[in-house]
Amino acid sequence: MINIDIFIKGKFIRIFQIICNLINSLKANKFERDLIRISYNYKFHNQSKYSLWNTLNTFNKVYKKNIEGSIVECGVWQGINLVLFQKLIEEYSLDSCKIYGFDTFEGTPNPTKEDITKYNELMKDEYERLKKKDNTSGWNNASMDVVKNN
C-alpha cells in the first residue's frame, strides 16, 4: 500500500526539481546546456539533471569568484562529475586547476537506521536488496578501471 504522504512529498520534490531545471536551463549559456544534456545522456551516469545542474552551479560560483585551487570529489562512483569538471576546466582554460577523485571502490558502506531517503524510507532496505552474494555492497560500486574508462 502506498503511503499518501510519501507519495505527495515525492511528487512535490519532482515538480520542484523540474522547475529548477527549467530555471537553470534559461540562465545557462549554450555550452552549459549542452554539457548537462551530454552528461545526462552518458550511459554511466546515475544523477538527475537537478543534481548535474547543482554541481554546475557550485562550480560556477567558485569560478566566478576567481577562487583558485583544485577540485576534490570524495566518492566518484563511475566518474560522471569528474568528466563534468574536466569539460568545464577545458572550456574555461583553467590549466592550473587539477581534479582529484577519491574512492574506496568498495561501494557504499552499510547504512544505519538514521540513514533515510528523501521519501523518509530506510536506506538499509535498499542496501539489503542490492547486496551481492558475497555479502558485499552492490550499491554504487564501480571499479577503478570502470572510472578510468569513462
Segments from the language model and where they lie:
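Membrane-proximal basic amphipathic "stem/tether" segments
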Residues: 1-45
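A broadly tuned "polar low-complexity/structure-edge" signature
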Residues: 2-11, 59, 76-79, 86
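Short, functional N-terminal and low-complexity linear motifs
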Residues: 20-27, 50-56, 114
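S-adenosylmethionine/decaboxylated-SAM
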Residues: 29-49, 65-150
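Conserved alpha-helix/loop element of class I SAM-dependent methyltransferases that forms part
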Residues: 54-66
